[in-house]
Amino acid sequence: MLLVPAGILGLPVCRTGRRGDVFVLPTSFGLAGGDTMAVDFLALNEKAIAEFRANEGECGPPFEGTPIVLVTMVGAKSGRELCSPLAYSTDDDDLVVIASMGGAPNNPNWYHNFVANPDVLLEVGTDQYEATAVLTEGEERDRLYAAQAAQLPVFNKYAENAAPRVIPVFRLVRASS
């Protein structure tokens, strides 16, 4: 077993995290390293957010080459404003995000935030705009998942690991001006 961060890395976790928690997953997910490594994933997210904003939407390793959107949302339970960096793909003018949690058996916290409070603020590169998170279903969900998995093949593994959970897919629709 290897202890690693979750969240924006999209890696499966055994439990949801709070600052200082350690995340556990099998080394079969292609991670290199020693026996264990304790990582505060909220601190990792904060670092990625700062790097994103300092570099006009670009992030270095381990996110280099992955399209990242910063999504500011309202917490379902806390009512607080929260920001999560998420991998995305596009479909027409919309962004698409997948609540894979790296193939974990449960949905990420941001999934519950989107369901409770679908109005969000997106940061893509240097562009900021309001959007609505729309949960997709059926053929549309399947098509969008397949399209993102074609761009980021690790999502195929996430679907296998999550089974029988069907991983939710959200369309982020720009709000009308």
Regions found by a protein language model. Give the residues of each.
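Short gly/pro-enriched beta-turn/loop segments at secondary-structure junctions
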Residues: 64-66, 165
